[in-house]
Amino acid sequence: MARITVEDCLEVVNNRFELVMMASKRARQLANGVPPLIENTNSEDKPTVMALREIAARKINSKMIDEIEKAERERAEREAMEWAAAEVVADEDMSKSDD
C-alpha cells in the first residue's frame, strides 16, 4: 500500500493541529481494540498509520472519534460500577456468614 502523507490527510482535515488530535485519539482507540474502519491489508501497520489511513479515506471524522471515545468511557464507568456493586454484595454476604 502506498505511503500515507500529511498532505493526504490535510485534504480532509482543516489544519495540522486538528489532524494530530484526531490521529492520536483514533490511534489510541485502535491500540485499545476498537476495530478499524478500513481493511488492514498490511498487518504490520501501526495504529497511528491506520488512523491516518482512515482519516485520508474519509472513513472517520472528529465527531465519530468523540462518540467512540464517549462510548468507551461510559462502558468503563459502567464496568467499574458493576465491580463496585459486586464487591458490596460480596462484603454483605461475608458479614452475614460471620454472624
UniProtKB/Swiss-Prot annotation:
Signal peptide range: none
Enzyme class: transferase
Reactions that this protein is recorded to catalyse: RNA(n) + a ribonucleoside 5'-triphosphate = RNA(n+1) + diphosphate
EC number: 2.7.7.6
Source species, domain of life: Bacteria
An annotated Gene Ontology molecular function: DNA binding
Protein role: Promotes RNA polymerase assembly. Latches the N- and C-terminal regions of the beta' subunit thereby facilitating its interaction with the beta and alpha subunits.
Classification via HAMAP family: RNApol_bact_RpoZ
Protein name (Swiss-Prot/TrEMBL): DNA-directed RNA polymerase subunit omega
Annotated organism of origin: Xylella fastidiosa (strain Temecula1 / ATCC 700964)
Gene for this chain: rpoZ
